[in-house]
Amino acid sequence: MKKIKLEKPTSGSQLVLQTLKELGVEIIFGYPGGAMLPLYDAIHNFEGIQHILARHEQGATHEAEGYAKSSGKVGVVVVTSGPGATNAVTGIADAYLDSVPLLVFTGQVGPLSIGKDAFQEADTVGITAPITKYNYQIRETADIPRIVTEAYYLARTGRPGPVEIDLPKDVSTLEVTEINDPSLNLPHYHESEKATDEQLQELLTELSVSKKPVIIAGGGINYSGSVDIFRAFVEKYQIPVVSTLLGLGTLPISHELQLGMAGMHGSYAANMALVEADYIINLGSRFDDRVVSNPAKVAKNAVVAHIDIDAAELGKIVKTDIPILSDLKAALSRLLQLNKVRTDFNDWIKTVTKNKEKAPFTYEPQNHDIRPQETIKLIGEYTQGDAIIVTDVGQHQMWVAQYYPYKNARQLITSGGMGTMGFGIPAAIGAKLAQPNKNVIVFVGDGGFQMTNQELALLNGYGIAIKVVLINNHSLGMVRQWQESFYEERRSQSVFDVEPNFQLLAEAYGIKHVKLDNPKTLADDLKIITEDEPMLIEVLISKSEHVLPMIPAGLHSDEMIGLHFTDENEEVDNA
């Protein structure tokens, strides 16, 4: 391998930072420890990269996720060996399922101690292998620039994902006078494939004979930077669209062809479109079970086309008639260039529009309890649907998906595939650092809040003005809902008998606390959401709230419960 001489002796830790800076990294999220002391010593006087000191390694990884999801850049994490690395595993797994580009540096004991059960040693490479796109253990200091450059490239290209670098302490300490050539040399790695004209023409030909097509808009549209092209394609052919959770914002909720989120807690119009369609075009979605519910019953009478950058996703869940392995942006760009095929979906559009009107998301205002749906709807109005919205996981996540009026790309930052409680607050911190001029609002339940609330310490420490909307029902709401619906109301360990005083907790972190419990003054009280300072807005809601409508596990998209039809003569299941 070609060697490159350095101007002066340089430590492994300095090489890490210099390489990251050359790659354009501006922020690192981390937490120090023994095996990473050499790197943190180098960080002390290093200029050009800001280090954000998390309060827990899980917090650091979620902060990096929020930063990456909001900006499209690679999120960088630095944690120590052993418990530092294992604490980061949840965030790494979350990033893996949601295709988030992360570069995670984990400390490791010295090379001579590896495999000998040394203090704070863990087989981090083995632990993270199933939940990373690739991982490395650096054994030679001169190899640091090459591996860091390669890992960064792998994290952000193809299907994005987390890449882990295990960095033994001795390797980061040693000084070298020359390095291995860091130029990329990955002859067997294909960044992405591009669809052929023949494949795309087949997709369009099927569209020309279709009468009831629908597009599933997935997170891949966001990740590939394809939102504008996607919208142009939808407009050109006038195809109704259903969104996955991670696909919200790819087409504005207000658009006449947007049917809303599909799946377990999706809209009636979206789910019925999947049932009635004769042609399903999946763009950048995994056919996740939370979207299609019962894969065996999906598209029984429909032709399925699926464009995805990952060959493993094509045909994995749902039988696919037109599988297209391709970078989505390239495929959509070419679809717009090809000669337009003749289509007529007017009758179909009338049908899906009627379904939107027939059973919209709705709720009954109450005089004694605040409705969470109304809280979210009002915040949507006050922010004009333009805020960066972050959620934790649970009932509030689904209400926010249903009721916030999304209109922008990368607007919703949430944990999709893994459904990680504790994601919300740190992810919002990362999103605000990526988009400092945006109003960043995080919705969190009282369960998820108590998992990572220590990250609130960063708000005043770094001047991060996020708004935390705590939807407090004194329970693990989604768990309780399932117990009440499917386990004969046995609320086993899902109700909090004792909770902290959230006002005192907010004051301990030096942030404003507002408690809202009066539905009559809610509209005025929530105007505080537009203020530019960190705050905790605690909204008290009833323990009896359920997220509806819902497709019970294993049932089909047309077997929803809890629907409310505008026509009183329609059959309603309020189970």
UniProtKB/Swiss-Prot annotation:
Annotated GO biological processes are: isoleucine biosynthetic process; L-valine biosynthetic process
Cofactor names:
Mg(2+); thiamine diphosphate
Catalytic activity annotated for this protein? Answer: 2 pyruvate + H(+) = (2S)-2-acetolactate + CO2
Q: Give its E.C. classification number.
A: 2.2.1.6
A molecular-function term among this protein's GO annotations: acetolactate synthase activity
The record's cofactor note says:
Binds 1 Mg(2+) ion per subunit.
Among Pfam families, the record links this protein to: TPP_enzyme_C, TPP_enzyme_M, TPP_enzyme_N
Q: What class of enzyme is it?
A: transferase
Q: Which InterPro entries match?
A: Acetolactate_synth_lsu, AHAS_TPP, DHS-like_NAD/FAD-binding_dom, THDP-binding, Thiamin_PyroP_enz_cen_dom, Thiamin_PyroP_enz_TPP-bd_dom, TPP-bd_CS, TPP_enz
Q: Does the keyword section mention DNA repair? A: no
The annotated region (Thiamine pyrophosphate binding) lies at 395-475
Q: In which pathway does it act?
A: Amino-acid biosynthesis; L-isoleucine biosynthesis; L-isoleucine from 2-oxobutanoate: step 1/4; Amino-acid biosynthesis; L-valine biosynthesis; L-valine from pyruvate: step 1/4
Keywords in alphabetical order = Amino-acid biosynthesis, Branched-chain amino acid biosynthesis, FAD, Flavoprotein, Magnesium, Metal-binding, Thiamine pyrophosphate, Transferase
Task: Report the family membership.
Answer: Belongs to the TPP enzyme family.
The note filed under miscellaneous reads: Contains 1 molecule of FAD per monomer. The role of this cofactor is not clear considering that the reaction does not involve redox chemistry.
Complexes and interactors: Dimer of large and small chains.
Name of the protein: Acetolactate synthase large subunit
- According to its UniProt entry, this protein's organism is Lactococcus lactis subsp. lactis (strain IL1403) (Streptococcus lactis)
